[in-house]
Amino acid sequence: MAGHSQFKNIMHRKGRQDAMKSKLFGKLAREITVAAKLGTPDPAMNPRLRAAVVAARAENMPKDNIERAIKKALGGEGENYAEIRYEGYGPGGVAVIVEALTDNRNRAASDIRSYFTKSGGNLGETGSVSFMFDRVGIIEFDRSVASDDAVLDAAIEAGADDVISGEGGHEVYASPDSFHEVAKNLEAKFGEPRKAALTWKPQNTVSVDDETGEKLLKLMDLLNEHDDVQNVYANFEISDALMAKMGG
């Protein structure tokens, strides 16, 4: 788990630095529409849609926006979006995974490639860095839902693989195959989680100096600000001082 908290800080920084809340809501709505289109429009029967709705609620997305995004799928929207995973190396040889939902593959690929190039990195082929990450499900709860032992016991009973509890809350990890069942069981016990999603967790992290770290954070910002980009993952650690300096 080396560097995990730093990794989380980078992900949280993304949320705080979105220039406009509407941009974030747009991305959340896109995921909701696509999830509803690929499955049933009922979150209770569609695990991916359920996770998307949980993510939207965690960002205080209005209920009307969520319902409107689901209705778009019923109206035929959402089928034009392609799910694409981009992989490459950023400054310092740091591995980066970018998940996108786009209705224009050429535009998305061109933009993302240019971001990597401008930062001193390079976009690779699919599979070029994902072997350095594990695909896992993560379910997060607020610290107040239960004691560390209670969450651990419930997670083990639900079939989870790992639990990390700290001041920031409880994080429960599960394999992709068991993720939705684990999330369902834990939600029945503790209520709706603040996050439930499949993620790419770095197997190991690399420490970078402040100069490289600054370039990497700028690359993360560029990627996260792109309308088509849904998630960005990387395997680096930076100093707390630099994180604070960059607004983390």
Swiss-Prot record:
- Cross-referenced InterPro entries, in alphabetical order? Integrase-like_N (IPR017856), TACO1_YebC-like_2nd/3rd_dom (IPR048300), TACO1_YebC_N (IPR049083), Transcrip_reg_TACO1-like (IPR002876), Transcrip_reg_TACO1-like_dom3 (IPR026564), YebC-like (IPR029072)
Q: Which GO terms describe its cellular component?
A: cytosol
User: GO MF annotations for this entry?
Assistant: DNA binding
Instruction: Write down the Pfam families for this protein, in alphabetical order.
Output: TACO1_YebC_N, Transcrip_reg
Keywords, A to Z, come to: Cytoplasm, DNA-binding, Transcription, Transcription regulation
The record's subcellular location field reads: Cytoplasm
Output the GO biological process annotations, alphabetical, semicolon-separated.
regulation of DNA-templated transcription
Principal localisation: cytoplasm
Task: Please give the family membership noted in the entry.
Answer: Belongs to the TACO1 family.
Q: What is this protein called?
A: Probable transcriptional regulatory protein BBta_6910
Naturally occurring in which organism (per UniProt): Bradyrhizobium sp. (strain BTAi1 / ATCC BAA-1182)
